[in-house]
């Protein structure tokens, strides 16, 4: 992610317009956790039977259950109730008064393997298989959570995403307080557990008997339980059907209805060139030409696909629960392409590039991108990742003060994915860019583009959204996701970039607990446009009508902007192998580094992998120094950074390593070798060392 895309002035003005207001008590709350109406979250308490749904359920929230902003408006986005289950990356949230995580012995982020201990106090079981799901648990350690009365949620995170369409049971048992005493169950749950439910929970007895039976089978004693509940994950179709429908109809209109074969067919998308800039060698020794234009893309949003537009859906057929977006004309998507000088003699490999947080395709002229283009003869093209592009900043500001409107971001992200797919097809269709004079070599008069294959190479937000794009892509089969991760509800509270957002978010929703709940809720919509919702289909299990893909995930150790833990969760979800040694001594907080991620070997180097890049400990020149916060350390000429904190806070010490991997020649060499038709993950670091970013020697 790139920092401070939201204009501080705009944020300040918007924040000042929020005025306090009271709100009525919510109804329809689960009595099993009375701290907040949404707790425990997620829970099948908030679902209803739905005919035609792939899970036989749909979400069933109401506005009265959601936190209100200071204007008194509920943060409930109605689009949530189109989901047939919850996010595959859901954090499991509840409030346990007085819990001490260490005394309880719950699996921590530093030792995930503890989840499988026979007496593990926090267990998540897949109802279908009876197997435990790997998790780690923490209390919210953000300063606002600690200072807020009853503000520290128990947060249980999946170490890899939950399976689509599966139902899980959460079991909390033998929880301890700071003195080591067992925390008693709440009255409502105790009545269910003891077989004598009363009041509001009496009608749930039959359902809970099934839960207790499953837990008994898993050797979890009913009498030991503090709390248990179940939840169901959204189905593959529900998560992806909007984007797949948009893709399939758009490519069919071009004359290509067989996208699974990975072959280009039909006509090229319509486009126009607005500007051609030829550079002298004095202007750029690396890039020969930049071309700016617009490509015509089917539009599936209101407002002509402008920021704030949302989807409308075709009427479902009888007995069908689906969400198929209506096409609403077309839109003109901006593109920028840069042709390297090397392409004037040898056609360049074409690659899409995705920009940073709330950024723009102008980032395609960054030094590291031009280096990659020049060193490895690659032509990069970019289009705004609308939904989260610079033009969406006003909408983002509005959403932070009113989360009920969040579907406008999620919907436009999916349109942005389609725009990138259409641009990619234009790059490799022989009658597209390759046939245009603007894309021909000035030396040979031949096309400067090698149209035999398309690739994806991106960083930060471009990588977070890029996993979703990869899962949907019919044209590129290999993607590099640089300094990325997945699951914004996990990423943002652990990112320094969130400081800027909270200039609006905190005044609008004053409780940290409410803000965490809202982030967790909107993740169910965010999934439709980022890797978290497509994780099970990025590599090994392609979506319908889609070829298989491989990815190379580059991670910056201790990244200040994209939480490293989210990248490792992504690696486990995507089935990646990991380059070892991943860390030098003392450079990981994990008892078992890269836990449950197999090792990269010569035998699997043709597949998908995770590689961690280390900028080294804090130092000024060659002298190791105490780490200061990023800006202060930067002013002193400091480089390097410590390992990320283990809590739910952002790393702030040392120089932010976020941009270092892409600035490292060895990392670019590794990317280039991977981004070939028969590419592999090559070894570019000493065999007995972790990979070091530029500036940190071996």
Regions found by a protein language model. Give the residues of each.
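Bacterial N-terminal signal peptides that target proteins for export
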Residues: 1-10
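C-terminal segment of classical bacterial N-terminal signal peptides
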Residues: 16-24
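Acidic, low-complexity Ser/Thr/Gly/Pro-rich repeat segments typical of extracellular/periplasmic
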Residues: 26-279, 284-305
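Structural recognition of the beta-strand scaffold that forms the well-ordered cores
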Residues: 92-94, 232, 292, 350-353, ...
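A conserved hydrophobic secondary-structure block that centers on an alpha-helix together
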Residues: 146-173, 177-178, 328-366
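Cap/lid segment of the alpha/beta-hydrolase catalytic domain
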Residues: 303-333, 344-443
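C-terminal subdomain of alpha/beta-hydrolase-fold enzymes, centered on the catalytic histidine
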Residues: 408-415, 477-698
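Primarily recognizes the serine-hydrolase "nucleophile elbow" in alpha/beta-hydrolase
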Residues: 430-493
